Amino acid sequence: MGQRQKLHKQLELALGSKRVYYQPPPSVKLEYPCIIYSKTDRELLRANDSVYKSFDRYQVVVLYTDPDFEATDHVLLLPWATYNRHYAVNNVYHDVLYVYSD
C-alpha cells in the first residue's frame, strides 16, 4: 500500500467515516463532517550532497458543523501532524492541519 493510501485510511479512522477526499473535483457534493486533503510540498533531507530522506506534506482540512466535533484531535494524534488554523464559512467549521508522510 502506498503512503498516500495509508494516510487515507488513517484519516478515515480519525473521522470515523469514509467521507475522506483526496483533491476532490468540484462536482463532488460534500456531506459533513468530512476531510479534504491534498499534497502541498515535499521536504528533502540532504547530507553529503545527496538526498537521504524525503517527506510529502499534505494539507488536511477537517470540515464539520458541530462545534464540539473531535476528529481534528484524532488527526493531530498522527505522527508529524501540526495544527495550522481554524475558520468558519456559512456555519461550516474548517480546521487546517499539515501531516507529513514518508
Where are each of the predicted segments found?
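A broad, low-specificity signal marking well-ordered, structured residues that form hydrophobic/aromatic
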Residues: C34-I35, Y58, A81, L97
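Short coil/turn motifs at beta-sheet boundaries
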Residues: L30, V51-F55, N90-V92
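Small/polar-rich, solvent-exposed N-terminal microdomains that initiate assembly or binding
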Residues: M1-L44, S50
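General N-terminal targeting signals
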Residues: Y37-K39, Y52-S54, L77-P79
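Acidic-leaning, charged glycine-interspersed low-complexity segments
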Residues: H74-D102
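Short, conserved charged micro-motifs
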Residues: P67-H74
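Oligomerization/assembly interface segments of phage tail-like spikes and tubes
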Residues: S54-D66, Y93-D102
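Glycine-rich loops and low-complexity Gly/Arg-rich segments
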Residues: L45-N48, Q59-Y64, Y83-A88
